[in-house]
C-alpha cells in the first residue's frame, strides 16, 4: 500500500509548486511517485480534431492513448469519482501525492499557506487529518508542526516520516 499524503490549501497558496518540488525530491531519492490532482473546473487533455477527441465525440466512454513512453486513459463518467476510487487506480508506486481534496479522503494532509493568503481560514484548526502546515510565515496557536514552504527537502523528509 503506497504512502498517500495530501497537499491542501486555498487557491494561490502554492500547493502545486510545493507538491511538484516534493515529488522531484522524492524521485531523486529513489521513490516511485504518483500524483492525483483535483481540478475544480472542467479540464480536457484532448484537443479538438485529434484522434482521441474524435473517439470521445463519437461516443466512446473510455479512450486510451499510447505512445512509446507513456499512455493516458480518458474516462467519461456520469458522476464524479471518489478520491478513493481514483487512488485505487495507481499501481507500482511508493508515494502518492494528492493535491486538493481538502474535504475528502482518508489520508494525512499538509496544509499549504503563504503570507499573501493568510486571510484564508486555517484548515489545520478545522481538520484533524491536517498533520503539518507548510508556510512562509509563523502563526500563533498552531496545533501541528510548521514546515518551511521553501524547503522541499524538509517537507519530503516529513512525508517519508509519516
Where are these regions (language model features)?
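Walker A (P-loop) ATP-phosphate-binding motif of ABC ATPase nucleotide-binding domains
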Residues: 4
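Hydrophobic anchor at the beta1->P-loop junction of P-loop NTPases
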Residues: 7
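Walker A (P-loop) phosphate-binding loop of P-loop NTPases
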Residues: 12
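Conserved lysine of the Walker
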Residues: 15
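N-terminal phosphate/diphosphate-binding loop that engages ATP/GTP or pyrophosphate donors
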Residues: 21-84
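Phosphate-binding/switch loop-helix module in NTP-utilizing enzymes
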Residues: 74-104
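Phosphate/Mg2+-binding loops and adjacent switch elements
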Residues: 95-162
Amino acid at each position: 500500500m503506497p504512502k498517500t499524503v495530501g497537499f491542501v490549501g486555498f487557491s494561490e497558496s502554492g500547493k502545486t509548486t510545493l507538491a511538484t518540488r516534493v515529488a522531484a525530491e522524492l524521485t531523486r531519492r529513489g521513490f516511485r511517485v504518483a500524483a492525483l490532482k483535483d481540478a475544480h473546473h472542467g479540464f480536457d487533455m484532448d484537443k479538438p480534431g485529434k484522434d482521441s477527441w474524435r473517439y470521445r465525440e463519437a461516443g466512446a466512454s473510455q479512450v486510451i492513448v499510447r505512445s512509446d513512453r507513456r499512455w493516458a486513459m480518458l474516462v467519461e463518467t456520469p458522476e464524479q469519482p471518489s478520491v478513493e476510487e481514483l487512488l485505487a487506480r495507481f499501481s507500482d508506486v511508493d508515494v502518492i501525492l494528492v493535491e486538493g481534496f481538502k474535504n475528502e479522503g482518508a489520508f494525512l494532509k499538509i496544509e499549504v499557506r503563504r503570507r499573501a493568503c493568510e486571510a484564508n481560514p486555517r484548515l489545520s484548526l478545522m481538520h484533524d487529518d491536517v498533520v503539518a502546515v507548510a508556510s512562509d510565515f509563523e502563526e500563533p496557536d498552531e496545533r501541528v508542526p510548521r514546515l518551511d514552504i521553501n524547503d522541499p527537502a524538509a517537507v519530503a523528509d516529513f512525508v517519508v516520516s509519516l
